Amino acid sequence: MSQKTERPVLSGQRIKTRKRDEREKYDPTGFRDAVIAGLEKTEGDLEQISKYLDSAGNKLDYRRYGEVLFDILIAGGLLVPGGSISQDGEKPRTSYCIFDAPESMESMRNHEQVFVKLIRRYKYLEKMFEEEMGKVLLFVKGFTPSERIKLARMTALWLVNGSVPPNVLLVLNNEHLIKDGIALEFLLELFQTFKQEKGIAYLIQALKKGGLESKLMDFFPPNKRTEEYFKQVFLDKELNEIVKLHKAQASQEAKRELQQALIDDINDEKPYNEITSDIKDFSQRTNIPDHEIIVIIWSTIMSLGEWNKKEELVTDQAVRHLKNYCPLLQAFASTDRSELALILKVQEFCYENMNFMKAFQKIILLFYKTEVLSEEIILRWYKEGHSNKGKMHFLEQMRKFVEWLQSAEEESESEDEQKNGE
């Protein structure tokens, strides 16, 4: 195996560093001075500012000083921790920035175009801008009320045009921004602007995309985290749909909590009457109706089964498993709506789990015999209440049972007529 021979080195020889390996000293103040000097020459004409920024990128190192560039365009100078402007140098700040612009949406949209053109021209600034916004939003407490309004409106515009992702707003979930109501105030202004620009449906979509839909209450000061205050704040700002979103999220969270509590109770072999009492207490606290409770119970008890993979065996296994839980299901099959909801859930489950396709009729028969389901609701499901999932298969499966129910019903009516005639 050949070894690599070392090249001879002359003693005392100095190896010269290539120019491309040399690195200039980091000088954000020098970069700031150059940008401010260029902006001053435009006299605040936004079209001229865009042209200047376009050409300056060929001379100034945007890759290295992108964060400084955005500091200047937003706040007019170098931002230091806390949100104030660095005062180093002869001219540390320019007035040609967002914070010194009028608050009007027309003004904000015009400034938005400066950023759009700049980032479109220098694509590598996209990621830097996203990181910059994470920093700037943390500094909002150090800005004036007017500056916060402008930043909130601009942030809404940047969210709408995709310059920054919605999850950047999560940095506002910070104790020192929350306790004084600054984070909430900022978000309300942002949400209103977003709704005005793009519509409420798009705003809701953005909140879900950013993972904020379940965290909205977290932005409220701790002493104001009540459902009533939440509702009042968003209704006052005509953001009714966010109240609905919050309710839906709270309901989903409550349902997950209920499901876990039910699993724990069953695993602990708690008596069914105690489980029933616990569920009813929980549903009253969380306003979950019986027709939703019964679906949760079904999903939970079916998740606890270890099902045979052979279709011919799974039907009997399912019936034996469900027989144990009929008293629990019966306690919440208290209305026509809850009974129908259960049948539809069983239909959906059997359709989505192919091994259970033949089990549907046996399950419904079990629920009929144990008085979980009434004859009336089974007939209603058959005639008009079924879903389209496996419709023909399940209707055919139920046909003989339904015919038997109908004939039994007719015999009962005939007997009643005879009694009345005597």
Curated annotation (Swiss-Prot):
Pfam families reported for this sequence: HEAT_5MP1_2, W2
Molecular function terms from GO: ribosomal small subunit binding; ribosome binding; translation initiation factor binding
Reported tissue expression: Expressed in mushroom bodies.
Entry keyword set: Phosphoprotein
A GO BP annotation: follicle cell of egg chamber development
Start and end residues of each W2 domain: 244-415
Top-rank taxon: Eukaryota
Residue numbers carrying Phosphoserine: 407, 412, 414
Region Disordered: start-end pairs: 1-26
GO cellular component, one term: axon
InterPro entries recorded: ARM-type_fold, eIF5-mimic_regulator, W2_BZW1/2, W2_domain
Disruption phenotype: Mutant flies show defective one-day memory but normal learning.
Signal peptide per UniProt: none
Function, as annotated: May be involved in memory formation.
Family affiliation: Belongs to the BZW family.
Protein name as it appears in the record: Protein krasavietz
Annotated source species: Drosophila melanogaster
Origin organism lineage: Eukaryota, Metazoa, Ecdysozoa, Arthropoda, Hexapoda
